[in-house]
Amino acid sequence: MAALGGDGLRLLSVSRPERQPESAALSSPGPGLCCWVSVFSCFSLACSYVGSLYVWKSELPRDHPAVIKRRFTSVLVVSSLSPLCVLLWRELTGIQPGTSLLTLMGFRLEGIFPAALLPLLLTMILFLGPLMQLCMDCPCDLTDGLKVVLAPRSWARRLTDMRWLRNQVIAPLTEELVFRACMLPMLAPCTGLGPAVFTCPLFFGVAHFHHIIEQLRFRQSSVGSIFLSAGHLIGPVLCHSFCNYMGFPAVCAALEHPQKWPLLAGYALGVGLFLLLLQPLTDPKLYGSLPLCMLLERTGASETLLCS
């Protein structure tokens, strides 16, 4: 060894691999295990949400006020406990988001006004054709219609309507909280932000499969799910509520409408404007810093266009 000299000793010291501390190697699970934990957590949330709807056994139809009230109770309990699942996921994976869990889930004030208005405006543009059809078929003019919509008595009547509360308030709020705000942060470090946005509807479909059992009819999913990537929950909730109110576009009825050509032009114009305005109205610069991007940076996930 002495014959090697200083240069030889340095060469041996460089070529010898350094042992990693066992504590560092065991501090967090590998990426494969993290993905399994994320998928299992999301699947558990979806099953819990659906299971809460069937806790109350009843022969009454799902639109009966008594059934709706019971389901309100169960889904509100599950939704209020769902952030605990994200907290448990963080502890199991060792991932540190770099921000509070509430901020990560879209509960923040920065950029809240554009996050509430711009996604809803974009969704209304997409529904330009159905909105035109609704106005054409309305027996009253626009002024009288606005008076009816804004009247306090009309709102008081809605707030006592269980089906309206379910479709416009409880379902959008609880579903977006569970299937967007809680699931996206858990899936994003595993799949990346873009694939995570398109993976969430798979779990969302689990929650809506029970409608096929109860009633064979199509129910649209929320158009506003992608806007959670703006870092706010309020946008997806409002868009979800609006889509529930509008329902699926009645294209067949538009084809048989007396004014079908203006209506079809409205449908085409709405889709065209939606595609044209989608990128500028969902620019992350409008909504402030994105907590999900901070999460991806801390986990070393590949960058997405939203975070660049």
Curated annotation (Swiss-Prot):
Q: How is its activity regulated?
A: Deubiquitination by USP17L2/USP17 negatively regulates the proteolytic activity toward Ras GTPases.
Identify the catalytic residues: 175, 208
Q: How does it sit in the membrane?
A: Multi-pass membrane protein
The GO molecular function terms of this record are: endopeptidase activity; exopeptidase activity; metalloendopeptidase activity
Gene Ontology cellular-component terms for this entry are: endoplasmic reticulum membrane
Q: What Gene Ontology terms for biological process does this UniProt record contain?
A: CAAX-box protein maturation; CAAX-box protein processing
Q: Where in the cell is it found?
A: Endoplasmic reticulum membrane
Q: Give all cystine bridges in this chain.
A: none
Its biological function?
Protease involved in the processing of a variety of prenylated proteins containing the C-terminal CAAX motif, where C is a cysteine modified with an isoprenoid lipid, A is an aliphatic amino acid and X is any C-terminal amino acid. Proteolytically removes the C-terminal three residues of farnesylated and geranylated proteins, leaving the prenylated cysteine as the new C-terminus. Is able to process K-Ras, N-Ras, H-Ras, RAP1B and G-gamma-1.
Protein name as annotated: CAAX prenyl protease 2
Species name: Rattus norvegicus
